[in-house]
């Protein structure tokens, strides 16, 4: 038995109800708390490198640290900028919270796409992502969180994957890396 006979009838009935009914349909988009929370600027700083751009940031116990990427295709050294996170400096002296503390320009952190802070080692780990220097493929750059000076480079895997996101999970004393592979994302622990 073929039920194709009823198909045109149900199609016409569906079209009739869609276009000639008085039903009101509405939709809403849920907004993020970040969109509805009141924001206020707490500080402003002059630009240190006019050709660079803010690429990533993280917070340590003492500072809010920003990475200013110096160049897209070259190996110019990037700048790490520290702003005071607290109302006192590391020695207990009063400072203006969120004011400029210091900056360091010494190393190319490649694209510097992600940063995280490890309070156990007092180090910042920077995921490079794109690499202009082939020896930086798959590298994570380690920086002293108190001085912002480069300490070492850690090669993860065989260098075939570049990492563009990094986080530190204190409860597990573990880093989480995010890699962009063809058509998907991968997380490495």
Model-found features: residue ranges?
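Sec-dependent signal peptide cleavage junction
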Residues: 17-29
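A short helix->beta-strand "capping" segment at the edge of beta-propeller domains
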Residues: 28-50, 98-99
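Beta-strand-rich domains and repeat architectures in extracellular enzymes and scaffolds
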Residues: 45-76
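Repeated scaffold domains used in trafficking and secretory/extracellular systems
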Residues: 50-58, 107-116, 158-169
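Short coil/turn segments that connect the beta-strands within blades of beta-propeller domains
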Residues: 61-62, 120-122, 172-175
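Short loop/turn segments immediately following the C-termini of beta-strands
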Residues: 69-72, 128-131, 179-183
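Structural motif
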Residues: 74-84, 133-142, 183-189
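Blade-loop segments of beta-propeller domains
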Residues: 90-121, 128
């Amino acid at each position: 038995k073929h039920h194709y006979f009823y198909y045109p009838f149900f199609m016409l009935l569906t079209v009739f109800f869609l276009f000639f009914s008085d039903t009101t349909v509405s939709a809403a988009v849920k907004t993020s708390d970040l969109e509805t929370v009141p924001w206020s600027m707490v500080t402003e700083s002059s630009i240190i490198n006019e050709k660079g751009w803010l690429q990533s940031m993280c917070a340590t116990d003492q500072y809010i640290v920003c990475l200013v990427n110096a160049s897209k295709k070259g190996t110019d050294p990037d700048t790490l900028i520290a702003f005071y996170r607290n109302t006192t400096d590391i020695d207990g002296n009063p400072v203006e919270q969120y004011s400029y503390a210091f900056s360091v320009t010494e190393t190319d952190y490649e694209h510097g796409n992600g940063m995280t802070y490890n309070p156990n080692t007092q180090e910042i780990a920077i995921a490079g992502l794109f690499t202009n220097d082939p020896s930086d493929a798959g590298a994570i750059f380690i920086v002293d969180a108190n001085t912002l000076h480069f300490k070492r480079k850690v090669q993860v895997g065989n260098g075939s994957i570049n990492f563009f996101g990094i986080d530190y999970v204190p409860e597990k004393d573990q880093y989480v890396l995010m890699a962009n592979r063809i058509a998907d994302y991968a997380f490495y622990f």
